[in-house]
Amino acid sequence: MQVILLEKVVNLGNLGEVVKVKDGYARNFLIPQRKARRATAAAVAEFEVKRAELEKIAAEKLAASQAQGEKLTGQTVQITQKSGVDGRLFGSVTNSDIAEALTKQGFAVEKAQVRLPTGPLKVAGDHVVAVALHTDVVVDVTITVIGDHA
């Protein structure tokens, strides 16, 4: 199925590009999330009319994400978790725990934006975690997991 992208989609294309994707990907993800529309002649003409408005919205989102990224760069977040004497945690620190801690510090971050490539943090200490604020803005944040030997 051919679709027109209404915003930048990672590993697919940029705003306004007409790309060919599998039917299920378009029907179940891109179209319901309003990231794309079917590429009919009428839809292409309608998109060209709205292109400037959509590009302006995309630029505003990028600028807001970059501003938040500058504030977030170099931040350190401390999370306390119960642990054993060897530093291994009882349980783990997940992306939702990190997002919650960042929100308490005044940064609007959702758990889906926190990237933990090796999975949840299971050891006390300092960990560098990526936070994807936008498809083009990824910031590294230091998470200090403090083991509570209670």
Swiss-Prot record:
This protein's record includes keyword DNA-binding: no
Annotated Gene Ontology cellular component terms: ribonucleoprotein complex; ribosome
Molecular functions (GO terms): rRNA binding; structural constituent of ribosome
Gene Ontology terms: biological process: translation
Family to which the UniProt record says this protein belongs: Belongs to the bacterial ribosomal protein bL9 family.
Function: Binds to the 23S rRNA.
HAMAP family, A to Z: Ribosomal_bL9 (MF_00503)
Annotated protein name in UniProt: Large ribosomal subunit protein bL9
